[in-house]
From Swiss-Prot:
Name of the protein this chain belongs to: Thiamine import ATP-binding protein ThiQ
Gene3D superfamilies in the record: P-loop containing nucleotide triphosphate hydrolases
Origin: domain of life: Bacteria
Alphabetic keyword roster: ATP-binding, Cell inner membrane, Cell membrane, Membrane, Nucleotide-binding, Translocase, Transport
Length: 232
């Protein structure tokens, strides 16, 4: 279980403050206007930002100040952060061993994830030789191969065409269910959120303004629907 209790980040001396509980294996969408604090929330969970105050626990262990490299979290960005001089296999392998010295079990795990992502025929290629969708599959494989209990998505598929974006969302959702991972996904699209997350959190002005069923939000009946431009 992921739990944030009054986790506070000072942005130009204006506090953003979050309290949130997410159960193990739950898939949650994080929505809200631009600049509301959605990415800040993910970066606090991932450890890329250190809160001024508050408590963050994962499975009842205090990770409030744990460095990102030691936090049981993986994060996928819109910019996939693949190393251009490394092959697909090497980029995925970094998720298992930063020195890329993989034993037989790790090699097997890497190829299993690549097969699951549909990129097992691309392992010798460089990122520059791949399409945008293929690069995001590689980046997702690198996250999943780490087998961390929490996966954070900061709009990684927003630049893809609609059909490919839906394909990637389905792939993420299915993979998280298979690995029993907790998923938190920032999105500007309530429709995308509804496809994989039964629960949504709406962030506004550095606070969690609303949380509840995604369908209720999409129907326009929720108090936060208007924040997203949804009319009942």
């Amino acid at each position: 279980m992921l739990k944030l209790t009054d986790i506070t980040w000072l942005y130009h001396h204006l506090p953003m403050r979050f309290s949130l509980t997410v159960e193990r294996g739950e898939q949650v969408a994080i929505l809200g206007p631009s600049g509301a604090g959605k990415s800040t929330l993910l970066n606090l969970i991932a450890g890329f930002l250190t809160p001024a105050s508050g408590l963050l626990t994962i499975d009842d262990v205090d990770h409030t100040t744990t460095p990102p490299s030691r936090r049981p979290v993986s994060m996928l960005f819109q910019e996939n952060n693949l190393f251009s001089h490394l092959t697909v296999a090497q980029n995925i392998g970094l998720g298992l061993n930063p020195g890329l010295k993989l034993n037989a079990a790790q090699q097997k795990k890497m190829h299993a994830i690549a097969h699951q992502m549909g990129i097992d025929n691309l392992m010798a290629r460089l990122p520059g030789e791949l399409s945008g969708g293929q690069r995001q599959r590689v980046a997702l494989a690198r996250c999943l191969v780490r087998e961390q209990p929490i996966l954070l998505l900061d709009e990684p598929f927003s630049a893809l065409d609609p059909a490919l974006r839906q394909e990637m969302l389905t792939l993420v959702s299915t993979s998280c269910q298979q690995q029993k991972m907790t998923l938190l996904m920032v999105s500007h699209s309530v429709e995308d959120a509804a496809r994989i997350a039964t629960r949504s959190v709406v962030v506004a002005d550095g606070r969690i303004a609303w949380q509840g069923k995604t369908d209720e939000l999409l129907s326009g009946k929720a108090s936060a629907s208007a924040l997203l431009g949804i009319k009942g």
